[in-house]
Every structure is written in structure tokens, then in C-alpha cells.
Swiss-Prot record:
Family the entry assigns: Belongs to the universal ribosomal protein uS14 family. Zinc-binding uS14 subfamily.
NCBIfam families: PRK08061.1
Disulfide-bond pairs as recorded: none
Protein name according to UniProt: Small ribosomal subunit protein uS14
Amino acid sequence: MAKTSITVRHQRKKKFEVREYNRCPICGRSRGYLRRFDMCRICFRKLASGAQIPGVVKSSW
């Protein structure tokens, strides 16, 4: 979990647009972010394995 201060600081608008970056809204993680699902890889894996994200199926071949 990200520190509360970092999460709050991220919500403020940056002076320069280039400095903005994505954060997971669930845990606040900045790395491993999946744009398509708007969350980090860890939260995605947890929710996908629990069948809470519609349309996501575990692949097997």
C-alpha cells in the first residue's frame, strides 16, 4: 500500500502535464499499472482469479 501522503499528493494537478502518472485506485501502486483495467497487476490478478472482472478468463493451452 502506498503512503497516504503520496496518494494525496498524486491527486493534485501537476504543474507540467508530462509529470502526471497513473496510480492504482485500489492500492495506490504506481508500477505495474494496466491502463485497460485501471489498476495494478497485483490487484488485477487478485480480482481476476476471484472472477470479479467480467470478460477476463484465465488462459490455458
